[in-house]
């Protein structure tokens, strides 16, 4: 249930922000509002997840919320990030390493997909969205700082489908 709730946070933030912009007649076109406004909404969704008021500002790391923002913005970016995460997880057996590397790839993947499909949008807009994606990815990496320390020390827990027997 937590998985579904975390995934819904990012998607709902993007879709709701897009709907509000359309209702208010902001002048943003259907082609670009979902990206720029989606990234802004996504950043706030991640911050709300990481620093929830009702848990005394101690929340999650923002991975699922962050990746679901990309699902709401561009499913191809989402799919690419999931594949990157899965490949790293299968090779290394570290969920945290997969999350960190996928987060680090956010700006690159965002830039490439938006560059290929940008049409007549100016390059500054592409760089703005890439910067916002980088901010989201950097925040997720920052939230994994204890995992990074454990990875360096060699005592991070590996992922397994099998439970450990006592």
Give the ranges of each region predicted by the language model.
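Multi-pass membrane catalytic core of lipid/isoprenoid biosynthesis enzymes
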Residues: 1-18
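Hydrophobic alpha-helical transmembrane segments
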Residues: 35-43, 67, 79-83, 96, ...
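Helix-coil boundary and interhelical linker segments in multi-pass alpha-helical membrane proteins
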Residues: 15-39, 71-78, 112-131
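Interfacial segments of multi-pass membrane proteins
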Residues: 17-21, 44, 62-92, 105-114
């Amino acid at each position: 249930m937590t998985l579904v709730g975390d995934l819904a946070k990012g998607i709902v933030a993007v879709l709701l922000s897009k709907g509000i912009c359309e209702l208010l007649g902001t002048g943003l076109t259907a082609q670009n509002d979902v990206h720029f406004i989606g990234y802004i909404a996504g950043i706030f969704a991640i911050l709300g997840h990481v620093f929830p008021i009702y848990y005394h500002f101690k929340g999650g790391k923002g991975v699922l919320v962050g990746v679901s923002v990309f699902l709401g913005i561009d499913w191809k970016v989402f799919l690419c990030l999931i594949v990157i995460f899965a490949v790293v997880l299968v090779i290394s057996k570290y969920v945290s390493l997969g999350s960190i590397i996928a987060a680090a790839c956010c700006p690159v993947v965002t830039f490439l997909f938006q560059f290929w499909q940008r049409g007549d949008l100016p390059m500054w807009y592409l760089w703005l969205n890439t910067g916002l994606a980088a901010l989201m990815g950097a925040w997720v990496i920052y939230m994994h700082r204890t995992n990074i320390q454990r990875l360096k020390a060699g005592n991070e827990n590996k992922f397994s489908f099998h439970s450990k027997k006592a």
